């Protein structure tokens, strides 16, 4: 919700939500514009798109596409807002994903990213690393699955740090 507030959504604007999952960001955006905006939800996972279509079937102005972030099937300068939530670290080519984001955004468009990354403060990193060992155990206990939480921790550890991401974003004209 804070992400949506940061965007200050306006009616008649176009949002692309990449790695959209089941469309929660698009729904929140529409709910804040009285459903007077165009939403494009993109995810490489056909199952997530199917669940999103079903869940948000009463939202007529959401278009759904199966596509990776690195190869978006849209013209240059199409969208006013580009969002990606917890999906950037899962792209196969981070540089290409950022390049595509810049390409499809209109001049002056806004790129908003929610993502986990490595902690750069050594004191906090020590706490995080110990806590992160518990997350898969908690996942096993609460939902009966450990593997997705193992993957989450591993993907965060393998992702670049915040400074490296900022450098890469600057190289892609953000």
Model-identified regions with their sequence ranges:
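Conserved alpha-helix/loop element of class I SAM-dependent methyltransferases that forms part
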Residues: 1-13, 28
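A structural alpha-helix within SAM-dependent methyltransferase catalytic domains
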Residues: 4, 27-30, 98-102
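Class I SAM-dependent methyltransferase SAM/SAH-binding core
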Residues: 14-71
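A short glycine-rich, Lys/Arg-flanked "PGG" loop and its adjoining helix->strand segment in the class I
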Residues: 95-110
């Amino acid at each position: 919700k804070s992400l949506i507030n940061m965007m200050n959504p306006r009616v008649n604007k176009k949002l692309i939500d990449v790695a959209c999952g089941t469309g929660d960001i698009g729904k929140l955006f529409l709910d804040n514009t009285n459903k007077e905006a165009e939403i494009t939800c993109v995810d490489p996972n056909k199952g997530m798109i199917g669940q999103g279509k079903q869940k948000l079937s009463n939202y007529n102005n959401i278009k759904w596409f199966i596509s990776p972030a690195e190869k978006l099937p849209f013209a240059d300068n199409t969208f006013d807002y580009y969002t990606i939530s917890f999906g950037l670290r899962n792209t196969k080519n981070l540089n290409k994903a950022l390049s595509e984001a810049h390409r499809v955004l209109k001049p002056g468009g806004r790129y908003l990213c929610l993502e986990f990354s490595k902690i750069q403060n050594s004191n906090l990193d020590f706490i995080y690393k110990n806590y992160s060992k518990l997350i898969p155990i908690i996942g096993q206990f609460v939902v009966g699955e450990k593997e997705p939480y193992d993957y989450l921790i591993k993907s965060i550890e393998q992702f670049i740090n915040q400074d490296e991401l900022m450098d890469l974003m600057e190289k892609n004209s953000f």
